[in-house]
Amino acid sequence: MKIQAIETVAADWSGDYLGIGFFEDSAAIDAGLTQLDQSLQDILQDLVSETEFQGKVGEQPWTRIAGPGSIRKVMLIGLGSPDAFTLDSLRQAAAAFAKAAQKQKAASAGLQLPSWDDDAAASTQAMAEGIELALHQEIRFKSDPDAKKPGEFPQEVHLLGLANQAAAIEKAQQICAGVILTRELVAAPANVVTPSALAETAAQIAEDHGLTLEVLEREECEAQGMGAFLGVSLASELPPKFIHLTYKPSGTPRRKLAIVGKGVTFDSGGLNLKVGGSGIETMKMDMAGSGATLGAAKAIGQLKPDVEVHFIVAAAENMISGHALHPGDILTASNGKTIEINNTDAEGRLTLADALVFAEKQGVDAIVDLATLTGACIVALGNDIAGMWTPEDSLAEELSQASEQAGEKFWRMPLEEKYFEGLKSPIADMKNTGPRPGGSITAALFLKQYIENTPWAHLDVAGPVWTEKENGYLNVGATGFAVRTLVNWVMG
């Protein structure tokens, strides 16, 4: 599929499937249709009347154009109130149009939507993202060869009334390549995406896009004192991999950043085994933080900003065997702090502890970690919103702006220091879990113990990384959540 931005407007375009966006305003709808309708024998006005189209979000009537005209089918796309119009409105509208064009088997499609904030480049990028992500399908594991073929339609999409936007489309496609990589990593089962597979993915990113890669094996992790991370991997027959990808710009970097992703490729719960009804069958996606980290690395490697970025993943399985971590064991992290294990199913924070210590040693200006860390965050915020914890107001503002531009939802949560009382241990520096109330807060407070002076934020993405329901450019399954926010943060 080829996406192009062209100066031609809807009234002059010819092709199989035309989509036109309208705000919720009957006068504007009438005025917008007048010129185009002159060549279509008032078909569009009839469509508006028959379907009672008002321009509301979700309204998408279409009709076939009879006769030998230059357009075969037309779709009207409701955009809602102009006051609520955002870049994500463009993504959603473009996604709906792309899926409709695919369903109608349109070889050529033309889409005309208003620009957001008179910013043609940002608007073009958002539309291209919506199209690319909407048409991505997870079909790798189908046995039918025909099912594995990419969709033939549409073959080309024209973004109408926009000229000289090739760079914006290319940027969208580079970012979407990272999102799609993340989707594929998170969607794949644990017998495919192992710690070694994550390391191999990192190696491919490094080779393709000029990043440097360091992978620490178990012995090297032991030498660095990574007892928390290695404790999680004790029961697995698959070796842990500590992955460190680095992107460096050609010149002096404007700043240095670290992104740390939780990389538990399967979480059985350990000896605190996840039982029926606990969602153990979904625990292949417990590495979604690392998936987003590698997806962001792929995108950043193509975009090549003037920022140095360290992408860090401590990859391991949390399994059961005679060598497994016991409840009551004490682990020592690489900063010397000791941890009493009172729940082996709170393992992600253990891997992140050593990863955060390692990240700070890189001398970066800020660190962001992301993880499917707690079910408590889903209870608090639902499946569509991720939690954000940081003591730094400026970093919180950076991430909020980046997420708003991406159309990904985060909500800043409190780092209530009083709650750390629940993590105190009589025999070690801390326990790895606290009481049930405020579970996502105590998890963030645990991670805070492994940061000394660097500005840091923790993102709990447990809810939004997966969806059971199609929604706009999000198809059922892995969503690729947080990649676009991370990219915007780095580029900002």
From Swiss-Prot:
It catalyses: Release of an N-terminal amino acid, Xaa-|-Yaa-, in which Xaa is preferably Leu, but may be other amino acids including Pro although not Arg or Lys, and Yaa may be Pro. Amino acid amides and methyl esters are also readily hydrolyzed, but rates on arylamides are exceedingly low; Release of an N-terminal amino acid, preferentially leucine, but not glutamic or aspartic acids. One of its GO terms (cellular component) is cytoplasm. Keywords: Aminopeptidase, Cytoplasm, Hydrolase, Manganese, Metal-binding, Protease. Mn(2+) 1 binds at D267, D345, E347. Its EC number is 3.4.11.1, 3.4.11.10. It is an enzyme of class 3 (hydrolase). It is found in: Cytoplasm. Mn(2+) 2 binds at K262, D267, D286, E347. Binds 2 manganese ions per subunit. One of its GO terms (biological process) is proteolysis. GO terms for molecular function: manganese ion binding; metalloaminopeptidase activity. The keyword Cytoplasm applies. It comes from the Bacteria. Its cofactor is Mn(2+). The active site is at K274, R349. Gene3D superfamilies: Leucine Aminopeptidase, subunit E, domain 1 (3.40.220.10), Zn peptidases (3.40.630.10). Disulfide bonds: none annotated. Belongs to the peptidase M17 family. Presumably involved in the processing and regular turnover of intracellular proteins. Catalyzes the removal of unsubstituted N-terminal amino acids from various peptides. HAMAP family: Cytosol_peptidase_M17. This is Probable cytosol aminopeptidase. The gene is pepA.
